[in-house]
Amino acid sequence: MNTSHQKIIALLGPTNTGKTYVAIEKMLEFDTGIFGLPLRLLAREVYDKCVQKVGVEKVALITGEEKIIPSTANYFICTVESMPKDKKVDFIAIDEIQMCADRERGHIFTERLLESRGNKLTMFLGSQIMGKIINDLVKNVVFEKKERFSKLSYTGIKKISRLDRKVAIIAFSIEAVSYTHLTLPTTLVV
């Protein structure tokens, strides 16, 4: 599948290290591109950023709930499920590639990992945990690592009402996330 003129990059690193930003900038260096994202809200955010840079007539948004497809679109920002399979483009990126391990949607991410290729560049963005799997499944992949801009550290248990600025709250279930959000002081920006 990978020919000599195609390049495949796995840009891996922790959350919030600028991987998506790098891929947006890289995509816009090419004439055409598809960007697959795991969430429709994230797809909308990337769509808005691309529209600001190149204009509304050059960017399409395709999700399960929303379709904005100008006839002159060169860049297609999509949820991974909505990525056009038959469209040939210079650049393809798939964000949060570690979703290959997801019970419900993993098969779609895995299919894109194995089959989706840009004519010139393909980028897989996500967690370093995917490094070995990508290396085993994708030929001639180049690995690039992104480091976190700032250090995260554990400061112990604190009351939610006494949180400092720039604090990350870690929760391990949707119920814990919902409860935490409901108990946050209304003065905090979430």
Question: Where do the model's predicted regions map?
Answer:
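Walker B catalytic acidic pair
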Residues: D95-I97
